[in-house]
């Protein structure tokens, strides 16, 4: 397996406070990695650095072998799905949003895409009544699951997941975690304290303290 995400001696500070301190690590293709850290410890900054929303004070970030910089960042973002606990999906009707997403998939037969959509809706427990809702009326957990469905339809294979199971019940938490972990070719970097991730033997756990990894 080769590296999909690499942090090379990253230093990052805000208002004089060190957030990341000479941090180096890699996430290989297909790995599922969970980051454990206290609030305000810089874990969300990891995602911002990968997506190019932040630049490190020192060091380099690579995605799929490419340096993350202003020249590469737009192409890199097209390959990544970022889903957080407060995901915004805009306004309007769910069917309209899903139709729009399906039309973006120009390289796959539409009938096959619609079949995949129905399978995803069923797996993530979206019944017909929920699908008819306005987007703004969805609960936090429904928005999280819908964002996952959209990311899968758009064929992302690198997922940055920030507390993505936080608003779900125990059964759905497990279904979401199992869904990602079962996809051997998907690379996932996850921020979570949820046991459904931490207790799975297929998941690698990194603990971030004082800007560095701790054993």
Regions inferred by a protein language model and the residue ranges of each:
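Conserved structural motif at the start of ABC-family nucleotide-binding domains
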Residues: 5-7, 20-22
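Helix-to-loop junction immediately C-terminal to a conserved catalytic motif
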Residues: 51
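Conserved ABC transporter NBD signature motif
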Residues: 59-68, 76
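Conserved ABC ATPase signature
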Residues: 134-138, 142
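Hydrophobic anchor residue at the start of the ABC signature
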Residues: 148
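ABC ATPase C-loop
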Residues: 152-153
């Amino acid at each position: 397996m080769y590296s999909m995400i690499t942090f090379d001696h990253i230093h990052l500070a805000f208002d004089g406070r060190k957030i990341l301190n000479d941090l180096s690590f890699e996430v290989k293709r297909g790995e599922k990695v969970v980051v454990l850290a206290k609030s305000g410890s810089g874990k969300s900054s990891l995602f911002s650095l990968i997506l190019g929303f932040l630049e490190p004070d020192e060091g380099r970030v690579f995605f799929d072998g490419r340096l993350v910089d202003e020249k590469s960042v737009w192409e890199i973002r097209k390959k990544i799905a970022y889903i957080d606990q407060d995901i915004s999906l805009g306004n309007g009707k769910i069917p309209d949003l899903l139709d729009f997403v399906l039309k973006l998939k120009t390289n796959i037969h539409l009938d096959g895409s619609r079949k995949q959509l129905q399978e995803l809706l069923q797996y993530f427990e979206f019944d017909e009544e929920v699908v008819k809702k306005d987007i703004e009326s969805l609960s936090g957990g429904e928005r999280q699951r819908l964002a996952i469905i959209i990311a899968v339809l758009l064929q992302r294979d690198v997922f940055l997941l920030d507390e993505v199971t936080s608003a779900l019940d125990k059964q759905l938490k497990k279904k979401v975690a199992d869904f990602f972990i079962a996809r051997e070719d998907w690379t996932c970097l996850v921020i979570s304290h949820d046991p459904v991730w931490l207790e799975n033997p297929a998941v690698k756990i990194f603990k971030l303290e004082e800007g560095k990894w701790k054993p």
